[in-house]
Amino acid sequence: MKKKIPEWLRQAQSKWTHRGQKRPSFALEPRAGEESVWDYPRPPAIQPDTRRVVVKIGEQIIADSTKAIRILETASPPTVYIPPNDINFSLLANASGSSLCEWKGAAHYFCLNGRREAIGWSYATPFEGFEAIANYLSFYPAKVECYIDSERVQPQHGGFYGGWVTSEIIGPFKGEPGTGGW
């Protein structure tokens, strides 16, 4: 059964100003081979990614995949979700806390075994339209090493956000100082 988005949340979604149809004047202009986060849509797009994605801490590989999914949302760097078959769950444990994404639904967090700090999250039963990422995991590049085709991913600013910033992604990005209203 599809998990429907509650009406109160649909109303909140309708209030967004930036939806990816028109790049705002403050957005950087992309050059060849670059992607502007201001061209990403809202609601977010789901895009398969066959590049090699590796997540590790020290020498321990947490995830290694060529079957990731990128979520592309206006104003944010892509968030990369990795299928459960490509995750080394022996290194992970459930972490406390949860959050609600207006597009994807209720997220739960996980941490490294023996630690408490969340390093990533997952949606067990995402809202309709995002079923493709059910039980896929995403990681915070600020807390673990994340790579796309051997390029080290930089974390999105703001602490809470989990966007994956690589050399082809340009902004400015939500989470930077002064971006609270985006």
Q: What is the role of each PLM region?
A:
Residues 1-182:
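Terminal leader/tail segments of proteins
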